[in-house]
């Protein structure tokens, strides 16, 4: 039983997956998308869902600082609906405010990553943080 965490942007989707017990999240990759052309990376997600035997999705919900839902959060919700329709799997959302900012800070301070390197990994790290925050809040997937 694994969860897939997604950080959905307008040009990329960061992807992370949990371990089978739901303790930790690992960043997998970044999928290029194009919202304007309605290219959402579903073919690649299908491969990953099958490969990792994913049972549910967790998407970051980028709320505004005043807790309201803005255009970017609405796009994330629409992406979640697309996933439900396509995969027939549950989709949950978690507040992701400042996740990308925190991921960037980590890359600079802890990994001393260049701006170019940050762009290559930041969405994957943000997806990992989104999923890890969700796992930490919900507890392990296999309760005894």
UniProtKB/Swiss-Prot annotation:
Keywords: Cytoplasm, Hydrolase, Nuclease, Ribosome biogenesis
Cross-referenced SUPFAM superfamilies: Ribonuclease H-like
Known EC number: 3.1.-.-
Pfam families in alphabetical order: RuvX
InterPro entries referenced in this protein's UniProt entry, alphabetically: RNaseH-like_sf (IPR012337), YqgF (IPR005227), YqgF/RNaseH-like_dom (IPR006641), YqgF/RNaseH-like_dom_sf (IPR037027)
Localization: Cytoplasm
Molecular function terms, GO-annotated: nuclease activity
GO BP: any one term: rRNA 5'-end processing
Domain of life: Bacteria
Top EC category: hydrolase
GO terms for cellular component: cytosol
Cited PANTHER family: POLYNUCLEOTIDYL TRANSFERASE, RIBONUCLEASE H-LIKE SUPERFAMILY PROTEIN (PTHR33317:SF4)
Protein family (similarity comment): Belongs to the YqgF nuclease family.
Record-given protein name: Putative pre-16S rRNA nuclease
């Amino acid at each position: 039983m694994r969860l897939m965490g997604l950080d959905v942007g307008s040009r990329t989707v960061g992807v992370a997956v949990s371990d089978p017990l739901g303790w930790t999240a690992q960043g997998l990759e970044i999928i290029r998308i194009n919202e304007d052309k309605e290219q959402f990376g579903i073919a690649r997600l299908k491969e990953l869902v099958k490969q990792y035997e994913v049972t549910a999705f967790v998407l970051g919900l980028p709320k505004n600082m005043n807790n309201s839902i803005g255009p970017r959060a609405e796009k994330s919700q629409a992406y979640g609906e697309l996933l439900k329709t396509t995969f027939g799997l549950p989709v949950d959302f978690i507040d992701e405010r400042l996740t990308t900012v925190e991921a960037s800070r980590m890359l600079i301070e802890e990994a001393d990553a260049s701006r170019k390197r940050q762009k290559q990994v930041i969405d994957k790290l943000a997806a990992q943080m989104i999923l890890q925050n969700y796992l930490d809040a919900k507890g392990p997937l296999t309760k005894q």
